[in-house]
């Protein structure tokens, strides 16, 4: 299997005045093409911090994060942003959709950040993927006009519209009731498999984690036996 993402000896320390807090200690992780991995841990275990480092949203205190053979933490923010937009999709517990934009406009936005994609092309690709998540009748609706499950479907469509090689998902169903959570994760899994995109998700839900190919337990910033 080819590695999409590789992290080695990741440490993260936050300094607040004279107080230093080590959140992550000596973590290694490899994500292979098409793989589905769940990172499980309680609140405060460092899951979201790790996801931010792997996605180039922050840099480790020490250690290396490689994405498609390129060292993220040697890049400036503009370069990391370009790598994120090219290779990664993000899904969060709270959808982070822009309230003033329609579903189509929200989903098209990552494509419009690419100079080679026209507005018309971006819109059509957004419509196509919204159709694939069952929202063909909600294209012109704004987030406030959608249900919680529908908003998360829009977020999934936005994450996948650029055809990323890896999706990073932070509690992707954590804000939904059981039935909606099952439906949304089933949809995400189906699209991830169809598009041959790798998925790395953090969750506190072991039932959800059981659906992944691999489960990793993060406790107090260290890997432990799952």
UniProtKB/Swiss-Prot annotation:
ATP-binding as UniProt keyword: yes
Keyword set includes Transport: yes
Places the protein is found: Cell inner membrane
Enzyme Commission number, as recorded: 7.6.2.-
Any one Gene Ontology cellular component term annotated for this protein: plasma membrane
GO molecular function list: ATP binding; ATP hydrolysis activity; transmembrane transporter activity
Alphabetically ordered keywords of this record: ATP-binding, Cell inner membrane, Cell membrane, Membrane, Nucleotide-binding, Translocase, Transport
One GO term (biological process): protein localization to outer membrane
List of residues binding ATP: 41-48
Domain ABC transporter: 5-226
Protein's membrane topology: Peripheral membrane protein
Family (UniProt): Belongs to the ABC transporter superfamily. Lipoprotein translocase (TC 3.A.1.125) family.
PANTHER family per UniProt: IMPORT ATP-BINDING PROTEIN, LIPOPROTEIN-RELEASING SYSTEM ATP-BINDING PROTEIN LOLD
Function: Part of the ABC transporter complex LolCDE involved in the translocation of mature outer membrane-directed lipoproteins, from the inner membrane to the periplasmic chaperone, LolA. Responsible for the formation of the LolA-lipoprotein complex in an ATP-dependent manner.
Known partners and oligomeric status: The complex is composed of two ATP-binding proteins (LolD) and two transmembrane proteins (LolC and LolE).
The protein, known as: Lipoprotein-releasing system ATP-binding protein LolD
Encoding gene, per UniProt annotation: lolD
